[in-house]
Design a protein with these regions (language model features):
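Asp-based phosphoryl-transfer active-site loop
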Residues: 1-12
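A short local structural element in Rossmann-fold oxidoreductases
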Residues: 6, 46, 158
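Positively charged, low-complexity intrinsically disordered regions
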Residues: 8-9, 86, 185
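Residue-level signal for pocket-adjacent positions within structured domains
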Residues: 11, 61, 70, 75, ...
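Glycine- and other small-residue-rich loops at beta-strand/loop junctions that grip anionic moieties
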Residues: 13, 37, 77, 182-185
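Charged helix-capping and loop-helix junction motifs
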Residues: 16-19, 187
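Active-site phosphate-binding/coordination module
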Residues: 18-118
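Conserved acidic, metal-coordinating active-site core of Asp-based
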Residues: 97-195
Length: 195
């Protein structure tokens, strides 16, 4: 059994009721396997994971990775290619109000031009970001990047990205009106659960 943890603007993940926790423990004690699939990055989900009884690896970063909290290691990742940094920086250069968060595998979130949406996202996820001057300075490997701006600006940004020949290498989608995510082609929660 796998459940999704949806993202709700401005809302942290609510606590799990004792009734649900007891039901999950019963399910697992009787041979069931349970895990979570979330769009949240590992640093943003880690503290919540301690509240969720799981006996199977969790999907994080909208399907960009499969993580085993028992062994504290990634079992599978769909890393972005190194070219994403230059491509993403080109997008930032064309859209001056946009910020981008870059999710490194080592529990670090870097942010280029953090804006009000970056700060709101930090508040909701309780995961801090490390500001960097450009996306080119963010170390690899990356699991996902996420552009943050007003919805209207992100629509134009998404349209620009979709016209680039390299866009075929990625999944580009809104996880919220002010958040446009980029993961490797084929990365999704469902696809990672199926693995």
């Amino acid at each position: 059994l796998n459940t999704e943890i949806p993202r709700r603007t401005g809302c942290p993940i609510p606590p799990i009721s004792r009734r649900n926790t007891d039901a999950l423990r019963y399910f697992m004690a009787n041979g069931g396997r349970f895990a979570v699939a979330t769009g949240r990055a590992l640093p943003a989900f880690r503290m919540f994971a301690e509240q969720v009884p799981m006996n199977a690896p969790a999907v994080v970063c909208n399907g960009g990775a499969l993580y085993d909290f028992k062994t504290e290691r990634y079992l599978e990742t769909m890393e972005l290619p190194e070219t994403i940094r230059g491509q993403g920086q080109d997008v930032l250069d064309r859209f001056p109000t946009a910020a981008v968060e870059a999710y490194h595998m080592d529990n670090v979130i870097h942010a280029v031009r953090p804006n009000e949406y970056t700060r709101q996202h930090e508040h909701v996820t309780h995961a801090g970001v490390q500001p960097v001057p450009t996306l080119l300075e963010v170390p690899m490997p990356l699991i996902k990047i996420m552009f943050e701006d007003d919805h209207e600006h992100l629509l134009a940004l998404r349209d620009y990205v979709s016209r680039q020949p390299w866009s075929a290498d990625y999944e580009v989608f809104f996880s919220d009106r002010t958040l446009l995510e980029v993961t490797r082609k084929g990365a999704s929660k469902g696809a990672m659960v199926a693995r």
